[in-house]
Every structure is written in C-alpha cells, then in structure tokens.
C-alpha cells in the first residue's frame, strides 16, 4: 500500500474517547464475488510507551490498530447524532467488527520516548468477499480510547490474499 522509501503520517487529537483514524486503498483485478483470506503485516513508527497513564485510557494500550477489507468503499458521513462515522463495521476500540479486526496496539515499550518502528500482524486469517467486479478496499486504522494527541507514521503495509 505504501510506496518504497516513504510513509504516511496520521495524527489526531481525541477529545471524545472515540477517535478512528484510517487509510484506505482500493485493490482491483481479484476474482469477482470470491471469498479471500487476508493476512496483514503493518509496520509503523510510534513514540508511545506501554504501561503509561492517560485520560480515557493508556496512550499505548488504548489505541488499537485495526486492519480489514470491504467490497464497499469506506467513507465517512455524519450520523443522526451529528457525529462523523465510517460506513463499515469496525467494532469498537479493542473489539473488532465484521469489516476490521484488532491486530494490536501502538505501544512500544515502557521506556519509549523516541519514534520506534513496531510491527503488528494477524496470526489467523481475516475473511472477506470481493465485490461484483473483483474489487476490495483495504483499510488500516487506529481506534482510540486515549483522550489526547496521537501521531503515527505508517512505513510499510503488506497484505497477503488467499482464495
């Protein structure tokens, strides 16, 4: 998903105990209407320590990394309570949903203060069906309960698909 020798910065200040930040990419050329097993390998730079205290939750363990896929394009829209929501089932914070699973958190180590590369992956496959034209949207994001600023840099994302 990410070109070699670059990265993607995501940053947000969570003020409501519920912030979802995500990146997405459409994959085409797959078999139409076919069930695929997906394995995600995400490398990112995080400067967040583990076992730290924070408002709403720990800045490391309360920011959950999620990965998923959908035949439906992920978009954000206002709901009937005037909140912006993604149109997919991402679950909530540590719990995955039908379209995204939890693959870990953004905590590095107890003594972290500098940005450090961390890797997260799913040991068991995530299953999703492609659309009628063989398309699948890949979504990687963080679902945060930590009420504060989170800034991350995605440096590599590898997705393996198996029929």
What role is predicted for each listed range?
Residues 134-163:
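Proprotein-processing/basic-patch segments
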Residues 18, 29-39, 133:
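Extended extracellular/luminal ectodomain segments enriched in beta-structured repeat modules
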Residues 15-31, 117-125, 154:
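Short beta-strands within extracellular/lumenal beta-sheet-rich domains
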Residues 102-124, 138-149:
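Short beta-strand-plus-loop segments that form exposed binding edges in beta-rich domains
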Residues 34-51, 140-142:
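A short beta-strand element within beta-rich, extracytoplasmic domains
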Residues 44-61, 73-74, 146-149:
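Extended, low-complexity, turn-rich repeat/linker tracts enriched in Gly/Pro/Ser/Thr and Asp/Glu
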Residues 64-111:
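Beta-strand-rich interaction/scaffold domains
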Residues 1-22:
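Surface-exposed, low-complexity/disordered Ser/Thr/Gly/Pro/Asn-rich loops and linkers
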């Amino acid at each position: 998903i990410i070109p070699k020798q670059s990265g993607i910065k995501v940053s947000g200040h969570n003020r409501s105990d519920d912030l979802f930040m995500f990146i997405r990419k459409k994959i085409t050329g797959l078999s139409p209407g076919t069930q695929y097993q997906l394995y995600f390998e995400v490398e990112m730079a995080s400067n967040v320590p583990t076992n730290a205290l924070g408002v709403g939750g720990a800045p490391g363990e309360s920011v959950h990394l999620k990965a998923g896929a959908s035949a439906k394009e992920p978009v954000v829209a206002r709901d009937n309570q005037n909140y912006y929501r993604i149109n997919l089932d991402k679950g909530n914070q540590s719990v995955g949903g039908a379209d995204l699973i939890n693959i870990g958190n953004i905590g590095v180590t107890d003594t972290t203060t500098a940005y450090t590369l961390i890797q997260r992956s799913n040991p068991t496959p995530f299953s999703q069906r492609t659309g009628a034209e063989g398309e699948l949207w890949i979504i990687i994001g963080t679902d945060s309960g930590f009420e504060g600023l989170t800034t991350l840099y995605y440096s590599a994302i590898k997705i393996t698909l198996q029929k």
